[in-house]
Amino acid sequence: MIRTSVRRVVVNSNKFDVRSISNSSIRFNVPNNQRTPPPAVRPPTSPIIVTEGGPKGGSQKQKKKFSFAGFLFKTAFWASVVYGGTLFVATKNDKVMDFIMDKQPPYYEELLNVIEHGSIEDLKRQLRDTQHKISNFDFKLPSKAKIDEFTHELESRGENLIEETKRKLGTSTGAKPRQAIPEGNSAPTPAEQLQKPVETIHKTVDHLPLIQLDKGIASSVDSSIKSTIKSFNDLILSIDAGSQSGNESLMREITENVSKLSSKLNKLTSSFDEELSSKLKISQSELLSSYTKKELELTENLLHQFHHEKAQMEKKLGSRLDQEIEATKQTISQAAVNAVSMMRVEQTKNFEKLIKGKIDQERDGRLANLDKLNSRITELENFSTSLESQLVANHQKSLIQQSLTKLKSLLLGASSEQEKPRLISPYVDNLAKVSHESKDELIALALQDLQPLLSRESTQSILSTPQLLTRWEQLVPELRSASLLPPNAGLLGHLSSMLFSKLLFPVKGAKPDGKDIESVIGRVESSLARGELDVAVEEAANLKGWSRKLADDWVKEGRKKLEIEFLMKIIDAESKIL
């Protein structure tokens, strides 16, 4: 099918630009500066060859034309790329986002929403919707009446074009007016005119462009169209040559070609309509048969699925019904068993209540003093229990006191040198065993500290207060000499300290404010004489230097005795309040 449309005819002074544009077939491709022979020379009678592309002759390279549509497309494309890139950067940069919010370009909110929240699934869904709309679009071919109307309009425009060309041709061939002679110059004489050189005037004539076919469709165009194009080109050349004799024959040839083209177009349209109607009928019958076949297949599949699902649902419903019946049976049987059990329990309670009432009635009648006797027996039982607990506690206390007395006699009693030493740990273990039954926490804690102190001690290893006093008196000369030693003393210092220590006078009594060695010795001796071992040990522990080093063993023995006495006092006091 060939679709042809004539847009417009533009006449500008002596230049005719006839543009007959086809959607896919005919275009002008001859530049405006094409030069043809001058008007006085007739054009050659040889046929004009229409080339498939480029200028006439095909020897010169065609200059690429400026495309306004391409320029608009490229500008819109790059502007869209820059705009979209700016919005994408705005989602990553706060400064660009602030700039976008201040300027508020068009559709920026929708585009930002698409960039931030859009996904491939949304694009696929929109593409499917677009395809669905395109597939549902009802495209209709032009009818025969519209084609006839378009053909008639094409013929009328062709005739108008020819008449306008003839009219313009008559006005363009007129002589140019002479130039006026300036008033200031006089007319030249014949002799002067003969002496002037001969001037050659070159006249430039603008020619009409020829009609050419596109390169891709030149081979597939019908011969009638080619003959029509050739007739138009001959007319254009004759117009450029200024010959008036061949215009009538060319007009007749053009009219015949246009009539042939119109008749051929009518035949083609009628054949196209017939072929289209036949193919539509065939397609309709095939589509109806395929729809019927598909409907039968779908009906059969649906019936098969319906029967299959029905069987499965009946099977599931039957199994579920059996399970519910079995569960209901079990529930009913269990409820019956529970009801029977409850009845038995109620009957048993009622029977017990009846028996109890009878017994209480009999007791109130014959055994009225039984409650008083029971209360007195309970009081007697409580008294005997308390008495027994007191006896046990007293016995426990007596055992603890006996063990503690034996331990005190061994530790604090005076032991002779002829007496054989005995270990104290068995007595401590006996005390722990006896006091364990009392379950007193304080006694247990005291025994935990006392057992490590006396685990390796005997009756001779624990020093008494007189023994500690004797050892202190033996230690006094060494303390005096050590107090007189200078710092970093040598042999001479030791000898001089021993010598001068003999000259010191002993101090008797207690001197609370004295800090010299004699005052300390006097306070320790007086404290030991009064039995204040803790005060004496504290005084000895406050010594400094070599004196403290010499008295270290004595201090340890004194502290051990003090710890033993303190722990034994705690056990004795706690055992008395059991």
UniProtKB/Swiss-Prot annotation:
It comes from the Eukaryota. It is found in: Mitochondrion inner membrane. Component of the MICOS complex, a large protein complex of the mitochondrial inner membrane that plays crucial roles in the maintenance of crista junctions, inner membrane architecture, and formation of contact sites to the outer membrane. Plays a role in keeping cristae membranes connected to the inner boundary membrane. Also promotes protein import via the mitochondrial intermembrane space assembly (MIA) pathway. Residues 169-191 are annotated as: Disordered. The gene is MIC60. GO terms for cellular component: MICOS complex. Residues 29-68 are mitochondrial matrix. The chain crosses the membrane at residues 69-91. Keywords: Coiled coil, Membrane, Mitochondrion, Mitochondrion inner membrane, Transit peptide, Transmembrane, Transmembrane helix. Belongs to the MICOS complex subunit Mic60 family. This is MICOS complex subunit MIC60. It is a single-pass membrane protein. Residues 1-28 form a transit peptide. PANTHER family: MICOS COMPLEX SUBUNIT MIC60 (PTHR15415:SF7), MITOFILIN (PTHR15415). GO terms for biological process: cristae formation. Residues 92-578 are mitochondrial intermembrane. Component of the mitochondrial contact site and cristae organizing system (MICOS) complex. Residues 248-317 form a coiled coil.
